[in-house]
């Protein structure tokens, strides 16, 4: 898959745009992970994916990882957390929703920055955190 070249500086990109991209990137990683684990029934996949992508799960992942994030990534997290979204959380409290947005913004920022190895590292940590909850 060929990526189009972006000339936009990820540091100047609206954090909600970063979160939009991060949501898609993280969801893709989750779905691939679940299929690799052997889940093939659509209903099973949907239920299992929700366990990873819910606002509550993403907030927990972010709060667990925050003490280990470098300053550059923490700045992105703060921008994402403080971004004013036009929508509200459907099935989450506002605090979890904001932290989930911050997590997605971080993933989007890393994607736009071309830091795919760092995304893989964070995603693997996220999977371990979510799977350790059961």
Curated annotation (Swiss-Prot):
Keyword rRNA-binding: yes
Protein origin, superkingdom: Bacteria
SUPFAM superfamilies given in the database record: RNase III domain-like (SSF69065)
Single GO term (MF): rRNA binding
Stated name of the protein: Mini-ribonuclease 3
Protein source organism: Brevibacillus brevis (strain 47 / JCM 6285 / NBRC 100599)
Cofactor(s) of this protein: Mg(2+)
Pfam entry (one): Ribonuclease_3
Cystines in this chain: none
